[in-house]
């Protein structure tokens, strides 16, 4: 391959190459019309512009070349037939890609010079379907990419760029499509892959950066980096990892920051200079050699990058890649320090009756559970074998592997004697797998076929020591086969580090003479392979060695044999990890007998055997069974035990420890020194992500119990004056949400503070009265609703009038640091602090009180003296300008830049919404109530959004240092049992009263307005709206100002059409009983149960809404189109959409009064007060459109 691009990037001066900016952003500023796209049906299909308006695309290319870009990308991001099919343009894919490449090359020729050649990258986006989630099969995706690559290649691009990758299986399909076209053409082009890491730190399907590198490392790509989703700040850690570990050139093409919704449009704040400074660091310190811009970047951004690129030298990198397997989530390195790679053996239909029975029953869920159990036992890779006579193994492998990929975090070893089955697994498993296995038993054809698919899918390979004459039984024969296979595999292009030799552990337990040497032969073969082929790995199926023995004897013999093999170089084994014993736990006599058996140390007198270790081993284990080890806890000093009680949230034995401590210390000393020290550790663990919130609350409950036990032993003065400070907290007027406020109460009160908790819906008068009574050191206001933030600001104005100046903490989901530190701080004379979470409040108080006590706090200036200089804790800067508390200031939009022109209301119906579709007939007109007796919770539980419950409500968040595998194991072992327990409790004690009112109202649209008519009127008129009918209600909806120009009214038949359409409405609640029971738990200091139940009630209300919407779809006749899994349901992959007032598509909360009036929700005890708060708290409402084009959007 001759490539001017590679010559340039690998030239001695190691230049930094600059890619262009955002194609979409810079097409939008041209204000293209539907006609420019070739008609309304193609509007939004940027790829079609190379045919309908090529000058628009050429303008973008020229602007970026003029700015100094070295490379522009073709306008083919969505250029596969699969994506173009959404516009009925699938058959144009080859032509559009070729035309786009030729267009970009023509513009490049206008700018290219010998000193600064210009290049064109063929852009290949991710498409709209993720193969790992089953949206599209691997072969279809690969075939679609083949068409695109042919067009780009024939159009003359200089390199191919697979970009914005969200799914590693999608990347493999693209890369293998590219390789197919290269084989057709007899030549290659440079390859670049750019993955997209979302704000949560992984790709969309959950892949970590290390896993992405492990998966892509086997492929012949030239550049690997990141683009899209975030700005450069959130890319830093990923780029750093690539810098240190990737063998490829590193690229970084960020957005201009994170997008924000400003006036209904995506707005990117990062300025050209800010982008320039960030990428300058990446070049000089991390060795990045390819830079550019993604969403929101304009020519001025690219000019800023080009200005620095010509003068900067990338840091010389010395990357070290550790050979690894990977799931779609995380990596597993092959090398294990002082141990071996554990490959779980129980998911094997050839060797496990349990697995075979489950496979025959096609009980896929139980097979997945069997896999998960091996994760708990310590397996690091899962061996997956579905070989069973009479079954369709290709289908079985696809079915099982596709489930394992999304449910188990370990890499897979696909195990079969037939390569077709292994490939079936590779087509659904996007991680880096290992193939088990190939050998020469059927000659070289099958041997090379397995190598071929290993190379194609980037997999490791197990090679058994078997040739055309059968299994190698002697050490010499085993090594001879290994050496032959090694030379062939290396010549084929398989790296030595990806080869696992299996020298075959054959039974030594049969008593057959020719089997006596099997153990020694295997050990000797391992030693020789390790010495002469040192870069390869050596794997064994250990349990074969003990075939036929008593289970207890097998466990010991397997453990001793494993140890012997490790000593001479074995580094991987297929075993049940929980069935291997450490040598220290094996009786010395048993050890010796096993060694004698492995090395065939029988003793003879003449021909008579006087000592047979096999016989001895059988005798030693006669009647014995396997036993599990139970270890006791160490005895700790009472001081340390008290601390551990708090940290572990363990109340068992607490009173005994406290009684012991009372003999040595005063009660206050026990609290202030040892118990609070434990709570301090809890706070540190929570802050570093090592402890989840529910466990923090367990610690708080234990702390509360300890203090309650000690109080009778205290003097009255001690009990009254012990508080570190006083903290006043309230949820503001009109807001019933108290979970966040109560968590602050729990954390502060159990860290030595006196907390005055006023409760929910507190008007400012109550807060002021409480202030005057308790004289708190700090006031905190909480609220979940957007409207609550306005009340907070109003309250601050009243505080000023009342002369209140103490620091005020504001907390709640609707708040942002910018609103607190700009709007609210400018309102209040004292200091305003953004309360990110309960521990942020605690940290502030822990600094405030000693500062006040040492006269280093001023209500107007904030911290003074030494306290004002501690990093992250300043409330004011040195010059007195107000800033935040430990949070980096946000960039603000210059108001003068915003448009001041009067708004013209657009009421023209969107052409993106098809008006000609069959309108359903509802089963009834009007409303219907479903009481608790009509609703089975067993039908609602499966619709729980577990991500929202576990992470959002219960706050079981994955710590950054925890692997995906460890996190999933934690959820399986700790969190799912909690959910199961609460499901049972809710059912047994009738703690939720699910109630629904829903209905169907006749409607028609008129511009941006939806007209609602009397259901009785339509019922009396044969289901039709009379022409002279008067609407009983109207809803006015906003319209998008650009793009598809959607408005909710567009989804319904127009008044002009005369068609009667259907407007479904719903309101659901789990009842006031949920609110009352949550209050009871909190009042009883049952903090953890309070968190669990409150969170579950909130999410059950959401699940009930999903259940009701599902019922409506079924009643309207298209429920059969629903997906068959909860994930797709929650991602709105059904027909139509559900909207709630207050959100961008229908923002007017006043309309909810009308909705509740139509549904007459007071009949189920659901209402909304004057502050627009719905009661009971755990309730939701929604309006529904059944139109296929209806999805969430911002207007």
UniProtKB/Swiss-Prot annotation:
Residues reported to bind methylcob(III)alamin: 734-738, 782, 838
All copies of domain Hcy-binding, residue ranges: 1-309
Residues that coordinate or bind S-adenosyl-L-methionine: 945, 1138, 1192-1193
Record EC number: 2.1.1.13
UniProt key word Phosphoprotein: no
Domain B12-binding, chain residue ranges per copy: 724-859
GO cellular component: a single term: cytosol
Residues covered by the Pterin-binding domain: 340-599
Cofactor stoichiometry and binding remark: Binds 1 zinc ion per subunit.
UniProt: Zn(2+) binding residues: 228, 294-295
Domain of life from the UniProt record: Bacteria
MF term (GO), any: methionine synthase activity
Cofactor(s) needed by this chain: methylcob(III)alamin; Zn(2+)
Enzyme class of the recorded protein, top EC level: transferase
Annotated CDD domains: methionine_synthase_B12_BD, MeTr
GO biological process: homocysteine metabolic process; methionine biosynthetic process; methylation; tetrahydrofolate metabolic process
UniProt keywords, alphabetically: Amino-acid biosynthesis, Cobalamin, Cobalt, Metal-binding, Methionine biosynthesis, Methyltransferase, Repeat, S-adenosyl-L-methionine, Transferase, Zinc
Annotated B12-binding N-terminal domain residues: 629-722
Family the UniProt entry places it in: Belongs to the vitamin-B12 dependent methionine synthase family.
Functional description taken from the UniProt entry: Catalyzes the transfer of a methyl group from methyl-cobalamin to homocysteine, yielding enzyme-bound cob(I)alamin and methionine. Subsequently, remethylates the cofactor using methyltetrahydrofolate.
Domain notes: Modular enzyme with four functionally distinct domains. The isolated Hcy-binding domain catalyzes methyl transfer from free methylcobalamin to homocysteine. The Hcy-binding domain in association with the pterin-binding domain catalyzes the methylation of cob(I)alamin by methyltetrahydrofolate and the methylation of homocysteine. The B12-binding domain binds the cofactor. The AdoMet activation domain binds S-adenosyl-L-methionine. Under aerobic conditions cob(I)alamin can be converted to inactive cob(II)alamin.
Identification of the protein by name: Methionine synthase
Organism: Synechocystis sp. (strain ATCC 27184 / PCC 6803 / Kazusa)
């Amino acid at each position: 391959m001759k490539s001017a691009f590679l010559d340039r990037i690998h030239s001695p001066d190691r230049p930094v190459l600059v890619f262009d900016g955002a194609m979409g952003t810079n097409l939008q500023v041209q204000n293209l019309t539907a006609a420019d796209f070739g008609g309304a049906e193609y509007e939004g299909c940027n790829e079609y512009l190379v045919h309908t308006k090529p000058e628009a695309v050429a303008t973008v290319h020229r602007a970026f070349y003029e700015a100094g870009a070295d490379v522009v990308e073709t306008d083919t991001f969505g250029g596969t037939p699969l994506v173009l099919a959404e516009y009925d343009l699938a058959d144009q894919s080859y032509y559009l890609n070729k035309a786009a490449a030729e267009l970009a090359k023509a513009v490049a020729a206008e700018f290219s010079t010998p000193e600064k050649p210009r290049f064109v990258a063929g852009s290949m986006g991710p498409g709209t379907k993720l193969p790992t989630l089953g949206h599209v099969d691997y072969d279809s995706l690969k075939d679609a990419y083949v068409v695109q690559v042919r067009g780009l290649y024939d159009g003359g691009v200089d390199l191919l760029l697979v970009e914005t990758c969200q799914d590693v299986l999608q990347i493999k399909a693209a890369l293998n499509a590219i390789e197919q076209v290269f084989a057709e053409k007899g030549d290659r082009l440079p390859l670049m892959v750019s993955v997209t890491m979302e704000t949560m730190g992984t790709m969309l399907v959950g892949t970590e950066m290390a896993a992405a590198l492990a998966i892509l490392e086997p492929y012949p790509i030239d550049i690997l980096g990141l683009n899209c989703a975030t700005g450069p700040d959130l890319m830093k850690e990923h780029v750093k990892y690539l810098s240190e570990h990737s063998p490829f050139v590193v690229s970084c093409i960020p957005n201009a920051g994170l997008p924000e919704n400003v006036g209904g449009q995506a707005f990117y704040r990062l300025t050209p200079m800010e982008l320039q400074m960030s990428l300058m660091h990446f070049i000089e310190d991390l060795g990045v050699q390819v830079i550019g811009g993604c969403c929101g970047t304009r020519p001025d951004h690219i000019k800023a990058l080009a200005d620095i690129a010509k003068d900067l030298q990338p840091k010389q990198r010395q990357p070290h890649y550790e050979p690894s397997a990977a799931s779609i989530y995380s990596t597993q390195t092959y090398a294990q320090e002082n141990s071996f790679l554990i490959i779980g053996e129980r998911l094997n239909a050839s060797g496990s009756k349990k697995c075979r029975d489950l496979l025959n029953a096609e009980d896929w869920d139980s097979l997945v559970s069997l896999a998960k159990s091996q994760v708990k036992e310590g397996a690091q890779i899962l061996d997956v074998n579905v070989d069973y006579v009479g079954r369709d193994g290709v289908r079985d492998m696809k079915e099982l592997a596709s489930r394992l990929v999304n449910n188990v975090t370990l890499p897979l070893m696909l195990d079969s004697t037939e390569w077709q089955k292994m490939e079936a697994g590779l087509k659904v498993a996007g991680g880096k797998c290992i193939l088990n296995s190939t050998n020469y038993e059927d000659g070289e054809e099958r041997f090379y076929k397995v190598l071929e698919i290993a190379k194609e899918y980037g997999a490791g390979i197990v090679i058994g020591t078997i040739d055309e004459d059968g299994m190698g039984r002697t050490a010499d024969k085993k090594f001879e086969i290994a050496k032959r296979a090694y030379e062939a595999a290396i010549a084929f292009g398989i790296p030595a580090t990806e080869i696992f030799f299996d020298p075959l552990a054959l039974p030594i337990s049969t008593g057959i003479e020719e089997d006596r040497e099997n153990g020694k032969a295997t050990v000797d073969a391992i030693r020789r392979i390790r010495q002469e082929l040192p870069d390869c790995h050596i794997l064994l199926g250990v349990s074969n060695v003990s075939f036929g023995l008593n289970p207890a004897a097998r466990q010991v013999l397997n453990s001793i044999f494993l140890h012997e093999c490790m000593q001479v170089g074995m580094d991987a084994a297929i075993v049940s990890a929980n069935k291997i014993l450490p040598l220290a736990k094996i009786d010395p006599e048993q050890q010796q007998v096993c060694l004698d058996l492995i090395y065939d140390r029988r003793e003879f007198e003449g021909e008579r055997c006087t000592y047979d270790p096999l016989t001895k081993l059988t005798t030693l284990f006669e009647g014995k069974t396997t036993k599990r080890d139970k270890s006791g806890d160490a005895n700790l000093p009472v001081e340390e035990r008290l601390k551990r009680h708090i940290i572990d949230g363990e109340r068992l034995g607490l009173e005994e420890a406290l009684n012991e401590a009372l003999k040595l210390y005063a009660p206050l000393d026990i609290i202030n020194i040892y118990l609070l020290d434990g709570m301090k550790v809890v706070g540190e663990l929570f802050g570093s992500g090592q402890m989840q919130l529910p466990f923090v609350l367990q610690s708080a409950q234990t702390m509360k119990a300890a203090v309650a036990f000690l109080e009778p032993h205290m003097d009255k003065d001690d009990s009254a004056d012990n508080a570190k400070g006083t903290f006043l907290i309230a949820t503001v007027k009109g807001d019933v949400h108290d979970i966040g406020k109560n968590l602050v109460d729990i954390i502060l009160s159990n860290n030595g503070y006196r907390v005055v908790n006023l409760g929910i819906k507190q008007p400012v008068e109550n807060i002021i009265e409480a202030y005057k009574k308790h004289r708190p050191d700090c006031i905190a206001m909480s609220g979940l609703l957007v409207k609550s933030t306005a009340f907070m600001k109003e309250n601050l104005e009243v505080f000023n009038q009342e002369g209140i100046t103490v620091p005020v903490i504001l907390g709640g989901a609707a708040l942002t640091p910018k609103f607190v530190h700009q709007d609210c701080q400018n309102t209040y004379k004292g200091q305003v602090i953004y309360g990110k979470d309960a521990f942020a409040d605690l940290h502030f108080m822990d600094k405030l009180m000693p500062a006040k006590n040492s006269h280093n706090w001023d209500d107007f200036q904030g911290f003074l003296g030494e306290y004002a200089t501690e990093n992250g804790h300043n409330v004011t800067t040195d010059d007195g300008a107000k800033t935040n508390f430990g949070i980096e200031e946000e960039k603000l939009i210059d108001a003068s830049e915003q448009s001041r022109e009067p708004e013209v209301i657009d009421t023209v119906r969107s052409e993106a919404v098809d008006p000609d579709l069959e309108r359903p007939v509802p089963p009834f007109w009007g409303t219907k109530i479903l009481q608790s007796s009509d609703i089975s919770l067993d039908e609602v539980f499966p619709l729980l959004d577990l991500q929202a419950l576990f992470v959002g409500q219960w706050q079981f968040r994955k710590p950054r240092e925890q692997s995906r595998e460890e996190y999933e194991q934690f959820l399986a072992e700790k969190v799912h049992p909690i959910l199961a327990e609460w499901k049972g409790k809710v059912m047994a004690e009738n703690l939720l009263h699910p109630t629904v009112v829903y209905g169907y109202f006749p409607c028609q649209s008129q511009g941006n307005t939806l007209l609602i008519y009397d259901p009785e009127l339509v019922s009396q008129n044969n289901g039709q709206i009379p022409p002279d009918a008067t609407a009983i209600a109207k809803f006015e909806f906003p319209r998008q100002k650009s793009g598809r120009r959607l408005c909710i009214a567009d989804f319904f038949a127009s008044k002009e059409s005369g068609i009667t359409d259907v407007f479904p409405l719903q309101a659901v609640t789990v009842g006031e009983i949920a609110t009352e029971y949550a209050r009871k738990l909190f009042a009883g200091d049952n903090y953890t149960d309070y968190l669990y139940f409150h969170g579950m009630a909130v999410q059950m209300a959401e699940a009930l809404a999903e259940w009701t919407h599902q019922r409506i779809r079924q009643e309207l006749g298209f429920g059969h189109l629903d997906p068959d899994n909860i994930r797709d349901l929650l991602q709105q992959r059904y027909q139509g959409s559900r909207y709630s007032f207050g959100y961008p598509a229908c923002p007017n909360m006043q309309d909810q009064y009308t909705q509740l009036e139509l549904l007459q929700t007071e009949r189920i005890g659901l209402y909304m007060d004057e502050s627009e708060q719905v009661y009971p708290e755990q309730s939701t409402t929604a309006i529904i459109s059944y139109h296929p084009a209806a999805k969430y959007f911002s207007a």
